[in-house]
Amino acid sequence: MDDSKKKRGTDYIEELILLYEDVPNPVQTDDMNHEVELTFIQPPVITLSTLLPFATSQESYILFTVTNKGVKIRNRINLSKIHGLDLKNIQLVDSIDNIIWEKKTLVKEHKIDSVALVKYSTEEKYIFLDYKKYLSAIKLELVNVVQVKVKHVTVDFKFKYFLGSGAQAKSSLLHVLNHPKSKPNPSLEFEIITTDEKIDSASLRKELIALFKLVFMASPSNIILDVVFKNPVQTILLKKNELPGIDLTNLYVTTKTDGVGVLITVTNKGIYCFFTHLQYTIRYDTTFESNESVTLYGEAVKQNNVWQIYLIKLITPKVSDRFKEKEYVEERLQNICDRMTFKVKKYEGPFESHSEIIDLLTTYLPSQPEGVVLFYSDQRNQPDYKIKLDNTTDHMINIIYRYMSSEPVIFGENSTFLEYKKFSDDKGFPKDYGTGKLMLTDNVRYLNNIYCIAFTNVYEDVGIKNVVVPIKFISEFSATGELIKPRIDKTFKYLYKEYYGNQYQIVVAHIRDQNIKIGDVLDEDKLSDVGQHYANDKYRLNPDVSYFTNKRTRGPLGILSNYVKTLLISLYCSKTFLDNSNKRKVLAIDFGNGADLEKYFYGEISSLVATDPDKEAIGRCIERYNSLNSGIKSKYYKFDYIQETIRSVTYVSSVREVFFFGKFDLVDWQFAIHYSFHPKHYATVMNNLTELTASGGKVLITTMDGDLLSQLTDKKTFVIHKNLPSSENYMSVEKIHEDQILVYNPSSMSRPMQEYIVKRVNLTKIFSEYGFELIDCVHFDTIIERSKRFINSVSKMEERKSTKNFFELNREALKHEGTDIDDLLRYYIVYVFSKR
């Protein structure tokens, strides 16, 4: 690194002072404020952590801005004056209670380099009476700011979330807090405070130097911010089952340090260290005398205020192998800096056999929390490999904010915590990876006034006591899903690039590898068992079979069944029907592709937890929810989907991972009870239902009438779609056992499925034994017959587009001449149970 071509912290200070010297002398009668500031465009995230302990103010507010040719007219409302987060943008504009805005005019701007610029602007009061005429021109931002103010200078670290325009009739505030792609835009500003007299440059320089030392943890003369870093060493996971096939030629093993990556250039002018957790370079004095520079990549830890640098790779000068790199560092880079010591590690190898290296790893791994690195000593074009006892992964997490509350903190029975959504990276897009709880303790604090989280004692090995991150950040997780610590370097990458943690496929590979023990990699039987486990997904009815086609043809049966479900859900979500004004909390069992998501939206529920054993159906449902939620996002209910079956003894604990306490007002079990309701599952199913259903809660069930099915003597075929060929236009039902039928609908199913026969007497008896009372029971044909007059007449008056289309579909479905729909509808039944 050539320091002569890079701006130092002192250069930024001088640029700011130089601009300030050009500002006119203050006039006491002048109502105009002269603002001179230095702005870092993509500041290191760590600077928030260094600034916060000395903050003179911390706050969040909504900023309203109208911009026109270098002029900004601004107003703001402190977030403490806004109740709840579900206000639409237009409502936020209506909350403005001051017609006196601030007019900011840009006089001069100079971009110093890619990371910083200086600006001189004037500020004055501006009476803006008719601002509501310019709603579409008003830009709204949520601003979180931490400020340190000294005599002549203020330092502001800001996170800005773009909310959209003032004309938008949607709640962007809640959306940006909850959506992973709505990232905060950070900035770091050093502003000179206007006084009645011009401040002398020496005083300013002294204050700015002190502030730079505070913020960047080094003298400004030794700070270089404009650095583009690319990791020179690629290290990838070596799957344990690949160990027996790895090339042993020149293969060596060394331990991995729990430090931070550092790219170092050593010259006779100084040692330049780019720290990955800081994302900038610090220069250190050196006694190194050679005219040839040395560049290396290593891992750094801090002990007694001295950096210990462990060599990973020598970049320049180039030598023939890794052992010569090690020798070079040992000979040339010893005792050249008081603040830094260069070290090398012991290399184990070479290996004569795979069993030898496996024996070594079996001994090493339990005592190495960060794992080991395998590398080839010759300079072949291959990455390094890592193996860990605990395959940690990096995920983007987003704290969850709820519909009405401005506080995400949840007060549990024995703990206080934040709930978060976890994401992995799917080719630059966030992929939902479940939810979790972040426990609030003395070492983890939620900073509610600036929407940030402070972690203590997680980076002590590198000399940092406190780390502060926004409510959206990248964190390291253990193989069991426990949050270990925030990743500062990866959070920097998330904020400024399209990065959401490890790629999803990499996460899956890490988790699968975790199930293999290092000592089992030569045992073919155990590896075979693991492979069989992945091939046979335990949650599917038959792991080798896909039961449903991707292209389903919806006919009259599907449309009319959907009508029945719509009535059922609307009725039991109604606040007036049950005289209950509270929004319902819903548990949906075997929810499938999520065809009823929209019904519950119109039912105005507060939350829905869905379960299903089929991960493919879960994926399609989540896609559907995200699509529905992309329009009026913040008004959609909270939704979680977990892969689980009601037949499992772990069902309740799995649900509790996302629904921490309380019980459900509604349990939705549509067209699926016939896969689980059998004597061998009664106890488990009913215990799960009892545990999760609130007193007075309702269980909504739709299924086929077992009493009618039990009377079948041979295969019965119903024509259900007159527009399809005869090979696809039917649904067949065949009794194959006293308690089982075989159902096949070729228009939507790839093969027949077995279902249990659910008889009314058995259903009501078992439910009654567990405290559930049958309060409603009706066949589909009865509901449709009662609804025909309404569908064919009164519903034609409906004008709302979506509802109008809904009834038009049902009117067409009722014209099902030439089919057996009426007969088939007799076989479908609704049960509603209420918990005593």
From Swiss-Prot:
SUPFAM superfamilies: S-adenosyl-L-methionine-dependent methyltransferases (SSF53335). Heterodimer of a catalytic and a regulatory subunit. Intrinsic methyltransferase activity of the catalytic subunit is weak and needs to be stimulated 30- to 50-fold by the regulatory subunit, which is itself catalytically inert. The record marks R74, K104, E123, D156, K158 as: Essential for RNA triphosphatase activity. InterPro entries: MCEL_GT_NTPase, MCEL_GT_OB, MCEL_NTPase_sf, MCEL_OB_dom_sf, MCEL_TPase, MCEL_TPase_sf, mRNA_G-N7_MeTrfase_dom, RG7MT1. The record marks K599, R624, H674, E755, Y828 as: mRNA cap binding. This is mRNA-capping enzyme catalytic subunit. It comes from Rabbit fibroma virus (strain Kasza). It comes from the Viruses. Its EC number is 3.6.1.74, 2.7.7.50, 2.1.1.56. Gene3D superfamilies: 2.40.50.830, 3.20.100.20, 3.30.470.140, Vaccinia Virus protein VP39. Residues 552-836 form the mRNA cap 0 methyltransferase domain. Catalytic subunit of the mRNA capping enzyme which catalyzes three enzymatic reactions: the 5' triphosphate end of the pre-mRNA is hydrolyzed to a diphosphate by RNA 5' triphosphatase; the diphosphate RNA end is capped with GMP by RNA guanylyltransferase and the GpppN cap is methylated by RNA (guanine-N7) methyltransferase. The heterodimeric enzyme is also involved in early viral gene transcription termination and intermediate viral gene transcription initiation. Early gene transcription termination requires the termination factor VTF, the DNA-dependent ATPase NPH-I and the Rap94 subunit of the viral RNA polymerase, as well as the presence of a specific termination motif. Binds, together with RAP94, to the termination motif 5'-UUUUUNU-3' in the nascent early mRNA. GO terms for cellular component: virion component. MRNA binds at S561, N562. Pfam families: MCEL_GT_NTPase, MCEL_GT_OB, MCEL_TPase, mRNA_G-N7_MeTrfase. The N-terminus contains the triphosphatase and guanylyltransferase domains, whereas the C-terminus contains the methyltransferase domain. The N-terminus is involved in binding to the termination motif 5'-UUUUUNU-3' in the nascent mRNA. GO terms for molecular function: inorganic triphosphate phosphatase activity; metal ion binding; mRNA 5'-cap (guanine-N7-)-methyltransferase activity; mRNA 5'-triphosphate monophosphatase activity; mRNA guanylyltransferase activity; polynucleotide 5'-phosphatase activity; RNA binding.
